[in-house]
């Protein structure tokens, strides 16, 4: 399980150090793709296979299902950690997530998310005040 928030930087070549706490679970290779809210999602290869199986059940007769699958899968790339624990984030994904030099990497249960730091801070500030309301509105879930 992934959890926590870490600040890292992109270098001039588009490489970013993956938080050491995430490296073990991700293994040497994992998948990153376009996420929601203009961030990137990162999945273990095993979790990626689970997602692929779920996506296969989406009805191809539904336009939105086709659009979502195209965006999600066309942006996916398998990345490999180098000896310094870095991954190379392709230009198209850096542009999608507006990644600049300063990044925030967060753990969200079964995935990691890579955010531009300013975007994450804005999202967090906007969401912080409504955190309890969101929890109440979602489902009856008890901690």
Curated annotation (Swiss-Prot):
What the entry lists under Pfam families is as follows:
MraZ
Name one process (GO BP) from the record: negative regulation of DNA-templated transcription initiation
| GO terms under cellular component | cytoplasm; nucleoid
Where primarily located?
Answer: cytoplasm
**What InterPro entries has UniProt attached to this entry?**
MraZ, MraZ_C, MraZ_dom, MraZ_N, MraZ_sf, SpoVT-AbrB_dom, SpoVT-AbrB_sf
Would you tell me the protein name for this molecule?
Transcriptional regulator MraZ
For the keyword Magnesium, the answer is no
| Annotated gene | mraZ
Enumerate the UniProt keywords alphabetically: Cytoplasm, DNA-binding, Repeat, Transcription, Transcription regulation
Q: How does it assemble?
A: Forms oligomers.
Q: Determine the domain of life of the protein's source.
A: Bacteria
Instruction: Say yes or no: keyword Cytoplasm present.
Output: yes
- What range(s) does the SpoVT-AbrB domain occupy? 5-47, 76-119
* MF terms (GO), sorted A to Z: DNA-binding transcription factor activity; transcription cis-regulatory region binding
Which family, according to the similarity comment? Belongs to the MraZ family.
Where does this protein reside within or beyond the cell?
Answer: Cytoplasm, Nucleoid
């Amino acid at each position: 399980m992934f959890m926590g928030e870490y600040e890292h930087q992109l270098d001039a070549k588009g490489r970013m150090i993956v938080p050491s706490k995430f490296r073990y679970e991700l293994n040497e290779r994992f998948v990153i793709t376009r996420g929601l809210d203009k961030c990137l999602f990162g999945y273990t290869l095993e979790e990626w296979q689970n997602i692929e199986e779920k996506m296969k059940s989406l009805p191809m007769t539904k336009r939105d299902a086709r659009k979502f699958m195209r965006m999600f899968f066309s942006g996916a790339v398998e990345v490999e950690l180098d000896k310094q624990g870095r991954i190379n984030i392709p230009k198209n994904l850096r542009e999608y997530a507006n990644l600049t030099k300063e990044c925030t990497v967060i753990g969200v249960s079964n995935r990691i998310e890579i955010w531009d730091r300013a975007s994450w801070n804005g999202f967090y500030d906007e969401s912080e005040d409504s955190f309890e309301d969101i929890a109440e509105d979602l489902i009856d879930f008890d901690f």
